[in-house]
């Protein structure tokens, strides 16, 4: 149980204790309660008073016996019996609950407005009926005399559903584009609806006509408020026959008297968050208003703050238990908070023991400040020989150890270890020696990957250190060796810098020239500082012309170096190409053989379409085709059987080609005229050899 004191008002948070995991068995839970003091001393007012993830709404039945809460995930409703201080039942729903209301004295009649436009009516056994409204709903109110449900939402109409007749009635047409909240006065049953334009429209359910219009947007603007947009109405609540509170989306609460169109009090939460809930405490004339961050309680007559509660999680809904000082909140957290404020009223009848508990805490306040105490563990108690004091007033159990008086601790420590001061002195001397050793020159161990780069960075770091000693105002540059973001660069071999790559060789001349230029500049600065010369316009001690000429010479130098590297790269590429050509020439090409898979049939290289067409024919037709082609010969044997001879197509074509050539040669011989009978004349003159 956590106790806070805000504005001299004590607030007891009954839900701040440790919670046990649901997956633990009962035996382990009991064992944990025996071991852990905080778990054993916690106050679990209602068993399992929580939701799996988030709780959105919470209400108390009119008879005060049942507490109902809606939450997610999965969307569900839980009912707690205060007489049994435990969960009575739980029902899972199809979609998230926007708002629900208890129509009966107990939990037997409940209405749920869901996020998918469905409205569910539940009875004791479960869901009784389910229907849908035309537009997405945001709030609803129940008119008891006529049994009408008024639904408001993303529409200008107020939908009326009569539960006695079981049908929709004529809607109320408003001037607003959308309506956020609504409420019905319990005394004279005036219906009020808060719009997104910052207005409140009041209707008479008897005549179904509008009887009033309040412009709350202009009234909520104060002198010290920055207006960023038109504030809309986010909360609405009646108090008695004449008073009404309106909450805006900018964090103001306006208290109205129905006889006037101007607010009596404008209370600003100073957070700029929409007001989510407004409650009235009639006994002390207090208004309890809540946004997602804070719950404020203030006087409705003068606006003076009474107290405030700031939960750890965002608040979704607030419910005040009737005629008591107990407060329930639905939060953006699994636990639903339970607050008990004795100044608001007594504890409810079902937890009257809280009054006695708070009285005991006030009579015997525990000192929570332990400046005069020393925290010791069980092991230290054994070393000091004080284990027999466990359970006595000299030791106060706290967490995993005990608190004991600091004077007693020093006395026992001196008796047990009289040479403690000498040990302390030796330890201090050892620390001083270690500090002096750390100031000596240390050999830095180079990493396994990128050793050259690491060595270069070490050298640059040393130069910057030397310069920073002389110029204290110079900002120290970050080093990637000590940066965790670049740690992998010196550990993973995949990040090794390839100094033979083309990119590195082309970039290296430029980098080396820049580093040389930087070193030269550092030397010049050191020289100027040593001589004591301070020149603001020419910090390097050179005229502008000389500096520009030096810069141009440097640029020419590294340009020549880059050209040289490019020429070397082209020459190396040419040599590699020639080497590949020589290897290709020496390599003897061999035919490639392809193996047919097991179970596959070899098919010739003819057109597959022709073969398929041939296979569709009958055996007789195929034999005739083969006979025409000359590849198939059928002959009868002497014993009455048949003999089939197949000739390969290639050999048959070769034979035909040879026969055609032979026939052509014979025809040429017949047509040729012989010249053997002709004799040539003897040549005159000297023969030519």
From Swiss-Prot:
Alphabetically ordered keywords of this record: Coiled coil, Nucleus, Repeat, WD repeat
Residue ranges the record marks as coiled coil: 422-476, 511-590, 647-679
Domain of life: Eukaryota
Gene3D superfamilies: YVTN repeat-like/Quinoprotein amine dehydrogenase
Start-end of Basic residues biased regions: 670-689
Positions with biased composition (Basic and acidic residues): 554-585, 658-669
Stretch list, region Disordered: 529-592, 646-689
Annotated compartments: Nucleus, Nucleolus
Biological processes, Gene Ontology terms: maturation of SSU-rRNA from tricistronic rRNA transcript (SSU-rRNA, 5.8S rRNA, LSU-rRNA)
WD repeats: 50-90, 174-213, 228-266, 270-308, 310-349
GO cellular component: 90S preribosome; nucleolus; small-subunit processome
Family recorded in the similarity comment: Belongs to the WD repeat NOL10/ENP2 family.
Protein name: Nucleolar protein 10
Native source organism of the sequence: Xenopus laevis (African clawed frog)
Lineage, broadest ranks: Eukaryota, Metazoa, Chordata, Craniata, Vertebrata
């Amino acid at each position: 149980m956590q106790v806070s004191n805000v504005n001299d008002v004590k607030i007891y948070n009954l839900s701040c204790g440790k919670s046990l995991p649901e997956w633990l068995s009962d035996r382990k839970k009991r064992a944990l309660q025996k071991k852990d003091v905080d778990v054993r001393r916690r106050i679990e007012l209602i068993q399992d008073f929580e939701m799996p993830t988030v709780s959105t709404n919470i209400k108390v039945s009119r008879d005060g016996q049942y507490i109902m809460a809606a939450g997610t995930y999965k969307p569900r409703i839980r009912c707690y019996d205060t007489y049994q201080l435990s969960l009575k039942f739980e029902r899972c729903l199809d979609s998230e609950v926007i708002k629900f209301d208890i129509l009966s004295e107990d939990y037997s009649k409940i209405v749920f407005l869901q996020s998918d436009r469905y409205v569910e009516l539940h009875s004791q056994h479960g869901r009784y009926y389910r229907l849908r409204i035309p537009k997405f709903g945001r709030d609803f109110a129940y008119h008891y005399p006529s049994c009408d449900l008024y639904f408001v939402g993303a529409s200008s109409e107020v939908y009326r559903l009569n539960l006695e007749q079981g049908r929709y009635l004529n809607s109320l047409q408003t001037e607003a584009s959308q309506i956020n909240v609504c409420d019905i006065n319990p005394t004279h049953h005036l219906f009020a609806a808060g719009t997104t334009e910052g207005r409140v429209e009041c209707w008479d359910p008897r005549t179904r006509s509008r009887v009033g219009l309040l412009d709350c947007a202009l009234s909520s603007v104060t002198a010290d408020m920055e207006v960023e947009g038109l504030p809309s109405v986010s909360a609405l609540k009646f108090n008695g026959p004449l008073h009404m509170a309106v909450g805006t989306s900018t964090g103001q609460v306006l208290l109205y008297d129905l006889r006037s169109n101007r607010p009596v009090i404008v209370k600003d939460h100073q957070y700029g968050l929409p007001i989510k809930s407004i409650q009235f405490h009639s006994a002390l004339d207090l208004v309890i208003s809540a946004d997602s961050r804070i719950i404020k309680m203030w006087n409705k007559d003068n606006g003076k703050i009474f107290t405030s509660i700031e939960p750890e999680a965002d608040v979704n809904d607030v419910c005040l238990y009737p005629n008591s000082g107990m407060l329930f909140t639905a939060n953006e957290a699994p636990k639903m908070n339970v607050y008990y404020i004795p100044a608001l009223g007594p504890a409810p009848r079902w937890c009257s023991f809280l009054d006695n508990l708070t009285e005991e805490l006030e009579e015997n306040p525990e000192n929570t400040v332990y400046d005069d105490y020393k925290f010791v563990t069980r092991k230290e108690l054994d070393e000091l020989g004080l284990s027999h004091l466990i359970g006595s007033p000299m030791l106060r159990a706290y967490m995993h150890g005990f608190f004991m008086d600091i004077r007693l601790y020093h006395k026992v420590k001196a008796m047990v270890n009289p040479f403690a001061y000498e040990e302390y002195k030796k330890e201090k001397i050892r620390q001083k020696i270690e500090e002096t050793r750390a100031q000596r020159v240390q050999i830095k161990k180079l990493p396994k990957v990128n050793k050259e780069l690491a060595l270069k960075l070490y050298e640059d770091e040393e130069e910057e250190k030397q310069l920073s000693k002389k110029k204290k105002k110079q900002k120290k540059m970050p080093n990637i060796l000590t940066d965790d973001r670049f740690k992998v660069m010196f550990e993973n071999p995949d990040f090794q810098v390839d100094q033979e790559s083309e990119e590195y060789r082309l970039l290296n001349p430029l980098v080396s020239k820049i580093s040389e230029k930087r070193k030269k500049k550092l030397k010049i600065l050191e020289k100027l500082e040593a001589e004591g010369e301070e020149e603001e316009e020419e910090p390097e001690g050179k005229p502008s012309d000389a500096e520009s000429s030096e810069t141009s010479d440097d640029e020419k130098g590294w340009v020549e170096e880059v050209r040289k590297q490019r020429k070397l790269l082209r020459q190396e590429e040419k040599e590699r190409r020639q080497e590949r050509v020589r290897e290709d020439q020496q390599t003897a090409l061999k035919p490639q053989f392809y193996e047919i898979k097991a179970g596959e049939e070899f098919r010739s290289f003819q057109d597959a379409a022709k073969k398929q067409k041939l296979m569709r024919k009958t055996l007789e037709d195929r034999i005739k085709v083969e006979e025409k082609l000359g590849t198939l010969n059928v002959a009868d044997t002497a014993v009455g059987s048949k003999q089939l001879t197949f000739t390969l197509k290639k050999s048959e074509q070769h034979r035909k080609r040879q026969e055609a050539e032979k026939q052509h040669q014979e025809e040429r011989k017949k047509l040729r005229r012989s010249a053997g009978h002709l004799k040539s004349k003897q040549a005159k003159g000297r023969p030519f050899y």
